[in-house]
Each structure stands twice: as structure tokens, then as C-alpha cells.
A protein has these predicted regions:
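Rossmann-like adenosine-cofactor binding region
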Residues: 63-65, 69-74, 91-117, 121, ...
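Mobile beta-alpha loop/short-helix "lid" or hinge segments that flank ligand
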Residues: 43-46, 96-97, 144-154
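Short, surface-exposed acidic-centric catalytic microdomains
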Residues: 30, 34-58, 63-67
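N-terminal Rossmann-like dinucleotide-binding module
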Residues: 1-43
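Single conserved hydrophobic/aromatic residue that forms the stacking wall/gate
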Residues: 152-169
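Short, glycine-/small-residue-rich phosphate/pyrophosphate-handling segment
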Residues: 119-148
Length: 169
């Protein structure tokens, strides 16, 4: 049985969907053995407790540095024997030290079709509210493995600050 750790920041609706899939037999080869939140008020912690799953809050606010926070997070994951990590609305960036400790074993659930509706303020229902406000006709979710690889980035070849579309060269 694969031991899964779920990291959450809020209500835990994705966590609940995973638990429901396990309860009804749709997922048969995994169990959620640990839920970690950075938010002590996250309802996801209650969802975990209701399923007799270890639920802990590890918040960056508890530590003097991000490095200490990251080390504690990694130690808890290792100590619990977690084999797969699911980021289910976890609003804290995962550092390379954790990604490297769990290569191809961290899955992120993002509530939009990436690259649309990503970044600061785009989480949970806010993503869908913003998509509806923009009149988007197709929306969805993205589930992807987390790694440290940046595929490609480049500055724009010309200044486009005054226009919505750059003219052709």
C-alpha cells in the first residue's frame, strides 16, 4: 500500500475527493497516512482527523527562517514514511531540497488549465471566479509532477508595454 502525504492550506476539498475515492474503492493501492497544513485553521486538518489520519500544522511562521521550515517539513515527511506527496491546494512553494528527496513523487493539483490563471491570488475558488469574470468558455484543472526543471524562459524581444499585441517585425 502506497503511503501518501497530502499538503494543504485550506478547506481540503481535493483531500476529501481523494479520501472518498479510497473509501469507495476507486483507489485501491494507496492510503493517506499524513496531512500537513501550513494553516492551523485549515478545515482539511479536521477532514484528516475525521478519517483517523495524522494531521499536523507546520507553518513557516513558526520558524526563524524558510530553511528551518523546509527542513522540518522534510523531516516530518520522511519520519512518516510517505512515499508520494500530493499538493492539494498547498500555497507554499516546495523547495528543491524536498523535490530532490522525492523525485517524480510529488504531484500538484492546480485548479486551472496551466498556464492560465496561475500565480499570486489564483487558488481554490478564486481561480474559477476569475475565469468566469473573464468570460472563459473552457476551464479545468491541471495535475502534474513537480520537479526543479525550468523548461524555458526568455525576456520579450521588444518593449510591448504600450500595446496588447506586438507588431510584426
Amino acid at each position: 500500500m502506497l503511503k501518501v502525504g497530502v499538503l494543504v492550506s485550506g478547506g481540503g476539498t481535493n483531500l476529501q475527493a481523494i479520501l472518498d475515492a479510497i473509501d469507495c474503492g476507486k483507489i485501491t493501492n494507496a492510503e493517506v497516512s499524513l496531512v500537513i497544513s501550513n494553516n492551523p485553521k485549515a478545515y482539511a486538518l479536521e477532514r484528516a482527523k475525521n478519517h483517523n489520519i495524522e494531521a499536523v500544522c507546520i507553518s513557516p511562521k513558526q520558524y526563524e527562517s524558510r530553511e528551518e521550515f523546509h527542513k522540518t517539513l522534510l523531516e516530518k515527511l520522511k519520519e512518516s514514511g510517505v512515499e508520494l506527496i500530493v499538493l492539494a491546494g498547498f500555497l507554499v512553494a516546495i523547495p528543491p531540497m524536498i523535490v530532490e528527496a522525492y523525485p517524480n513523487k510529488i504531484i500538484n493539483i492546480h485548479p486551472s488549465l496551466i498556464p492560465s490563471f496561475c500565480g499570486v491570488g489564483y487558488y481554490g475558488l478564486h481561480v474559477h471566479e476569475k475565469a468566469l469574470a473573464r468570460g472563459v468558455r473552457v476551464t479545468g484543472a491541471t495535475v502534474h509532477f513537480v520537479d526543479t526543471c525550468l523548461l524555458y524562459t526568455s525576456p520579450s524581444p521588444r518593449d510591448i508595454s504600450g500595446s496588447r499585441m506586438p507588431s510584426s517585425a
